Amino acid sequence: MKLKRGKPKEKFSYDPQKVLKKLEDLAYKILEEVKAGKNPYFDVPTRGLSNVYFDEEARLIKLGDKLSRRYFLNVAHARKFMQTLILMAYVKRLVSEGKHASLREAYYANKHTIPGTHENTFEDQSESDPIIEDLERMLGVLREEMHITADRRGYVYGDIVIKDGEDEFNASKLGMGGWAVPGTVEHIQFPEINVDYVLVVETAAMADRLIEEKYPKRERALIIATQGQASRGVRRLIHRLHYEEGLPIIVFTDGDPYGWYIYSTIKQGSINLAYLSEKLATPDAKFVGMTMDDIKEYGLEHVTEKLKGIPPDKKGGPTGDYKRLIEELNYPWFQNKEWQRQLKLALKWGVRIEQQALANKSLEFVAKEYLPEKIREGKLLP
């Protein structure tokens, strides 16, 4: 199976004026309702499992069309209504001035005592973060497009030129640590790409091993280390590299329910961020490993780890890894025969297999045999 760069399917262009227009339209709506003597309100798409579904055609977890109405003249709603307007004004200022703020900074910048009262606008960041998510859903824009960011996590290594503001650099010339993925990647451009595909790797240790073994250069691959669950910035970057630059996406995680869930969120999106799946998820992604079949195929039986928790056939079960496996068995996006086989084998054998277990063969085995052979032979899960 020869991987090669395909044709771009979409082109993203960040336009701050569109974000400002959406903010202003919503603000004018509230203003007109006040002028007309009406009770102003926001319609907020409802969060929660009851308003989430799997779109089989798009292969994405999506948010449904249920709305909750938040009124100003309602004791139960008034505080959140006020907080929403405060953060709308703050976002407008950030976008207009071209500045960015972290979630923590957004909280502190808008926390103050309301004049003439003993009430604070926000008591804790747990109040401001959900309002920012509400704005994402109401406006149909990413938090990052509103110039609000989270901490950096994950890094990129490979022969790709990245333009970040006024800086331009090759991600294979920055040392083994590569380029740290920022909280927002909306402004990032890719003037030159000399790779055939993206290999998304769960652990930094495995990514470092592949870099040390010269895998990116030899296989013309771009390595993206997620360092655990992929951050929004990493997921958005993966999405853009596939849809805008035509790069195939292959995911490599531990062979356990947590690693498979990491793959699931990259491919289909997540329930918590269902409203962002079309901008964060990459349904065309494929999975190379680790799988239960790898254990016997490569003679790794003696380096497996036991699943954590109580099995379903024992008193108090299922818990831990077993509970997550059963949940994944029932996910609509894991109903194909290939994934049903892997999940059922994990339950039957009661084991998990880590990426690093391949070092039992040799340090270079993963880079020179395991990955190249599986990818070349097309041994990938959907």
Swiss-Prot record:
Keywords: ATP-binding, DNA-binding, Isomerase, Magnesium, Metal-binding, Nucleotide-binding, Topoisomerase. NCBIfam families: PRK04342.1-2 (NF003333). GO terms for biological process: DNA topological change. Its EC number is 5.6.2.2. The active site is at residue 108. The keyword Aminoacyl-tRNA synthetase does not apply. This is Type 2 DNA topoisomerase 6 subunit A. It comes from the Archaea. Pfam families: TOP6A-Spo11_Toprim (PF21180), Topo_VI_alpha (PF20768), TP6A_N (PF04406). It catalyses: ATP-dependent breakage, passage and rejoining of double-stranded DNA. Its cofactor is Mg(2+). Residues 14-155 form the Topo IIA-type catalytic domain. Homodimer. Heterotetramer of two Top6A and two Top6B chains. Belongs to the TOP6A family. GO terms for cellular component: chromosome. Relaxes both positive and negative superturns and exhibits a strong decatenase activity. CDD domains: TOPRIM_TopoIIB_SPO. PROSITE patterns: TOPO_IIB. The lineage of its organism: Archaea, Methanobacteriati, Methanobacteriota, Thermococci, Thermococcales. Mg(2+) binds at residues 202, 254. GO terms for molecular function: ATP binding; DNA binding; DNA topoisomerase type II (double strand cut, ATP-hydrolyzing) activity; magnesium ion binding. HAMAP family: Top6A (MF_00132).
